[in-house]
Regions:
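Conserved Class I S-adenosyl-L-methionine
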Residues: 65, 184, 189-248
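A short SAM/SAH-binding and catalytic strip from SAM-dependent methyltransferases
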Residues: 120-134
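A short acidic, Gly/Pro-enriched loop at the edge of an enzyme's catalytic core
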Residues: 110-121
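A short glycine-rich, Lys/Arg-flanked "PGG" loop and its adjoining helix->strand segment in the class I
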Residues: 135-147
Length: 248
């Protein structure tokens, strides 16, 4: 089973913490992947346009090894990384050990160990919030968000080639339209963003594609990439918690 398929299947089952087999099993390779992603900065620019975290409290849900925590910590007042996999909790804690404004805790999207209405921004990047099945996490994010706070979900766009084509090869039954409708019905706005992944060596590129896809699809992807870089599409989904009472 491909790594993407494992995550989607667990999401549909409503699992409390979704396995992220790529970073759980190969954290060193996933660190290479994180460094290769978004080399144009398009994702961070889009997030900054949609969400203001300067001087505010942020929670990064499914923070993994904490790769994105330093970026938030540059301007946020406080940053909390939440991660269900204990080895990654330790890695993220070590990464941020010298920054007193950042805390890393064990927890899940369904059980965020923070008080009600305690953060202005909840961020999740390619973690848990994949579509139907993530409703408990949406409720929990609303609980920890203060009125007017924003949940920002960054996920891959399966419609965007070539990466989306490779994803669909491993997920032939995946219904992108149903996923889009799910988030639209839940009140999210969607911004589609193209950025690039760029690697230092072909060996790095091949290793990363090897942990993201089944063996056959990874081999096809490696053969189709010329050089060290390729475009990748993302969806940046945002939903703001209402500031007042909702009358129905």
């Amino acid at each position: 089973m491909s790594r993407v398929r494992e995550r989607i299947a667990a999401s549909r089952r409503g699992a409390d913490s979704l396995p992220s087999p790529n970073i759980w099993r190969w954290p060193e390779v996933y660190e290479v992947e994180n460094r290769a992603q978004d080399v144009t900065g398009a994702l961070w620019r889009t997030l900054a346009e949609l969400v203001d975290w300067a001087g505010r409290d942020v929670v990064d849900i499914g923070c993994g090894s904490g790769f994105h925590l330093p970026r938030f910590a540059e301007t946020a007042r406080r940053v909390t990384g939440v991660e269900p996999h204990e080895p990654l909790v330790r890695l993220a804690g070590s990464r941020m050990a010298d920054n007193p404004a950042v805390t890393v805790v064990a927890g899940s999207a369904q059980r965020i160990p923070l008080p009600d209405a305690s953060v202005a921004v909840a961020h999740a990047r390619t973690a848990y919030f994949f579509g139907p099945g993530c409703e408990p996490g949406l409720v929990e994010a609303d609980r920890v968000l203060a009125p007017g706070g924003v949940l920002a979900i960054v996920d891959l766009d399966v419609r965007h080639r070539p990466y989306g084509k490779w994803m669909r090869a491993d997920l032939p039954s995946y219904d992108a339209g149903a996923t889009d409708r799910f988030f639209a019905d839940a009140g999210f706005e969607c911004r589609r963003v193209e950025t690039r992944w760029r690697f230092e060596t072909r060996a790095d590129l091949e290793a990363v594609l090897g942990i993201e896809f089944s063996a056959s699809v990874a081999a096809r992807a490696v053969a189709e990439v010329v050089g060290l870089s390729f475009p990748v599409g993302y969806r940046v989904l945002t939903r703001r918690r209402p500031t007042g009472l909702i009358v129905t």
